[in-house]
């Protein structure tokens, strides 16, 4: 186990590969398919250039020019940050807008964060949390009005609980 927690293990499936590609595009500035291929290999996913090209096409990934002039892949509405730009601020602003009206309480319990919402809103809140690359968060489980955020350890759960509460309070 590393300092940041256990590494994510993925099955050798198409869905897992597409998820890994989406995550790589959201967290790295990817300028070429060979660069993306190397990142996937580091994740334990071997892929041919032809498959990678088809996957990017299917995901509607396009090359876009960043503010600094770099041309990089982006998917849909996602915008990759250039050097020095904080991806977290943009993600926090988006999360804050959603969480502000939907979170009724937040509590840490062991390595979990329990987030309460109005009836019917938990799935949406969990989806918003899952779409952000949040350090120390492994994933979420949602019911009707409760989201369980699974963290790598107890300390991370406490800090993520405080952070989610602050986002919901903005």
From Swiss-Prot:
Subcellular location: Cytoplasm
Pfam families named in the record: Arg_repressor, Arg_repressor_C
Record's GO cellular component terms: cytoplasm
Pathway per the UniProt entry: Amino-acid biosynthesis; L-arginine biosynthesis [regulation]
Keywords: Amino-acid biosynthesis, Arginine biosynthesis, Cytoplasm, DNA-binding, Repressor, Transcription, Transcription regulation
Purpose: Regulates arginine biosynthesis genes.
Family designation: Belongs to the ArgR family.
Annotated protein name in UniProt: Arginine repressor
Lineage: Bacteria, Bacillati, Actinomycetota, Actinomycetes, Bifidobacteriales
Gene, per the UniProt record: argR
């Amino acid at each position: 186990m590393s300092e940041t927690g256990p590494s994510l293990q993925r099955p050798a499936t198409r869905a897992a590969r597409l998820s890994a590609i989406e995550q790589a595009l959201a967290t790295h500035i990817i300028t070429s398919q060979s660069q993306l291929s190397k990142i996937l290999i580091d994740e334990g996913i071997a892929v041919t250039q032809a498959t990678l090209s088809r996957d990017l096409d299917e995901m509607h990934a396009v090359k876009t020019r960043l503010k600094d002039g770099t041309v990089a892949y982006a998917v849909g509405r996602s915008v990759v940050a250039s050097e020095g730009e904080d991806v977290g601020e943009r993600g926090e602003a988006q999360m804050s807008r959603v969480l502000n009206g939907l979170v009724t309480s937040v509590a840490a319990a062991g390595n979990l964060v329990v987030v309460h919402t109005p009836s019917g809103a938990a799935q949406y809140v969990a989806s918003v949390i899952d779409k952000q690359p949040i350090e120390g968060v492994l994933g979420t489980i949602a019911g009707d009005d409760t989201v369980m955020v699974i963290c790598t350890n107890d300390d991370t759960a406490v800090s993520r609980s405080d952070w989610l509460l602050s986002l919901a309070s903005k």
